[in-house]
């Protein structure tokens, strides 16, 4: 068993394909469903649980960060404490629903739940929950639109024109 499987037990046995370099804070708070993919240079700060359901894709250079800090300046200022240091960090879990795709250089902030079959655009910063079947983009990320059957058919047409084989799941069959 490799170091990664020791840190993240759910990464073995088909749980995830993870490309190096991969950075995490603890590893033990990261939970992968089956068939997840994590591209290179991703950072998972797992002070609280990070859960990726089945089939989640994570693009290159994505940050998934559960830590949070006080909003007010005087609460963050360590010089005000006698020891010169005070750790006011806390963490909130992150949950990403099955079939979602987090595109390159996106950031997912603590406390966020991303629904099933969502697309988070490249460079987006997700600070709020995302409903199922949505595309979000921007800083902060906002819902652009819902995904529907027409989107599924467009993907199907693209695959057929390029003669790319699709799995039964991608065709929407059981």
Region roles according to the model:
Residues 1-15, 139-174:
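Terminal amphipathic alpha-helical/low-complexity segments used for targeting or macromolecular assembly
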Residues 6, 30-32, 130:
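Short, T/G/N/S-enriched strand-turn elements that build extracellular solenoid repeat scaffolds
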Residues 22-32, 37-113, 139, 146-148, ...:
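Flexible, glycine/small-residue-enriched loop-and-beta-strand segment within the central core
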Residues 75-88, 123, 165-174:
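Short flexible/disordered coil segments
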Residues 79, 134, 156-158:
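A generic membrane alpha-helix/interface feature
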Residues 108-137, 141:
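C-terminal/domain-terminus segments
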């Amino acid at each position: 068993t490799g170091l990664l499987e020791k840190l993240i037990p759910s990464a073995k046995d088909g749980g995830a394909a993870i490309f190096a370099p991969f950075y995490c804070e603890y590893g033990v708070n990261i939970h992968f469903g089956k068939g997840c993919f994590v591209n290179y240079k991703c950072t998972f700060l797992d002070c609280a649980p990070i859960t990726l359901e089945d089939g989640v894709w994570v693009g290159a250079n994505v940050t998934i960060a559960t830590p949070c800090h006080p909003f007010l300046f005087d609460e963050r200022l360590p010089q005000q404490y006698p020891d010169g240091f005070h750790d006011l960090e806390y963490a909130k879990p992150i949950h990403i629903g099955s079939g979602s795709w987090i595109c390159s250089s996106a950031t997912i902030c603590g406390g966020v739940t991303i629904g099933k079959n969502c697309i988070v655009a490249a460079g987006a910063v997700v600070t709020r929950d995302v409903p199922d079947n949505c595309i979000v983009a921007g800083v902060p990320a906002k819902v652009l639109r819902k995904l529907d059957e027409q989107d599924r058919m467009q993907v199907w047409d693209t695959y057929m024109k390029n003669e790319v084989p699709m799995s039964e799941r991608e065709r929407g069959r059981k």
